[in-house]
From Swiss-Prot:
One of its GO terms (biological process) is DNA repair. Residues 1-180 are annotated as: Large ATPase domain (RuvB-L). This is Holliday junction branch migration complex subunit RuvB. It is found in: Cytoplasm. Keywords: ATP-binding, Cytoplasm, DNA damage, DNA recombination, DNA repair, DNA-binding, Hydrolase, Nucleotide-binding. The gene is ruvB.
Length: 326
């Protein structure tokens, strides 16, 4: 009986995982990138070689981790995942690399956060498939070389500019993920609703897409939260009225802007002239990295903010939008 009582919770976890596509043909958006990736994968399989190292870069929530997992499934190899902050010393990297089998995929998220000493160890591993480890201390120190099987490193970053040039140049397949179109987001939301067994009206899906900032992760997160309200109220489906009401409760306006976005815009609006990112960070009590990664990309995309050599400035379009806000 215990297994039955856990069934609903387990099914929910599986559904949330299954919202992610599992093969390239099911991946919505990034059309040119996907087509190129298919060619690279097919070529590697034809030659029975490991796929060349891949660098996925772009704003958060666009599918970098999902793509890395799909690549390993398309290649029919094992997938190992870690992140830059977790690899603090050479031994951490060696422990991961020595568990890989031939052609396996190693995914390093936030690869821009690797320290330089780890990068230097990674150079040899990526180019020559070997590790040079220092053994011993003082005069007796020697280098121990460990051979590695050919593998594929997939790095993901939201801040390409923070990668050192030597590391960036060692990726044979750099791929830039862009914001998704409105129609692509609508399709992603509909697919997510099917996986979650949630009935959704066309107008509701389109309203969520309007406020999802061109980002699938945000679209699916909003969908889940709206579904929560629908289930608690015992409604039968997600309608436009329900979606609009819940999104307003969540603090997401018609443009997909949240409280932090509005605070950012209002600060620029009330400050004369261009404003530096450090000044904005202090005024909003927000980390510079968070502002540059999660706030500014979308505001720049919708032409609300411009970056200039002297700092950030509001566009006339943003000023007009703010004038209509309460």
């Amino acid at each position: 009986m215990k297994s039955i009582s856990c069934g609903k919770e387990y099914t929910e976890d599986v559904r949330n995982i299954n919202i992610r596509p599992e093969q390239l043909d099911d991946f919505v958006g990034q059309k040119d990138l996907i087509q190129n990736l298919k060619v690279f994968i097919n070529a590697a399989q034809t030659r029975t070689e490991a796929l060349d190292h891949v660098l996925l870069y772009g704003p958060p929530g666009l599918g970098k981790t999902t793509l890395a997992q799909i690549v390993s499934k398309e290649l029919r190899v094992s997938f190992r995942a870690t992140s830059g902050p977790l690899l603090s010393k050479a031994g951490d990297l060696a422990a991961v690399l020595t568990t890989l089998n031939a052609k396996d995929v190693l995914f390093i998220d936030e690869i821009h956060r690797l320290n330089r000493s780890i990068e230097e160890v990674l150079y040899t591993a990526m180019e020559d498939f070997c590790l040079d480890i220092l053994v011993g201390e003082g005069p007796s120190t020697r280098t121990l070389r460990i051979d590695l099987p050919p593998f594929t490193l997939i790095g993901a970053t939201t801040r390409l500019g923070l990668l050192s040039a030597p590391l960036r140049d060692r990726f044979g397949i750099p791929l830039h993920l862009e914001f998704y179109s409105f129609e692509e987001l609508v399709n992603i939301i509909k697919r997510g609703a099917r996986v979650l067994s949630a009935e959704i009206e066309e107008d509701a899906a389109r309203e969520i897409a309007c406020r999802a900032r061109g980002t699938p992760r945000i679209a699916l997160r909003l969908l889940r939260r709206i579904r929560d309200f629908v289930e608690v109220k015992d409604d039968k489906k997600i309608t436009y009225e329900v979606a609009d009401s819940v999104l307003l409760k969540l603090g997401v306006d018609k443009m997909g802007l949240n409280k932090l976005d509005m605070n950012y815009l209002r600060f620029l609006f009330n400050t004369s002239g261009p404003v530096g990112i450090d000044t904005i960070s202090i005024a909003l009590s927000e980390d510079v990295g968070n502002i540059e990664e999660t706030v500014e990309p979308y505001l720049i995309k919708i032409s609300f903010v411009k970056r200039t050599p002297r700092g950030r400035v509001l566009t006339d379009q943003a000023k007009e939008y703010l004038s209509f806000q309460h």
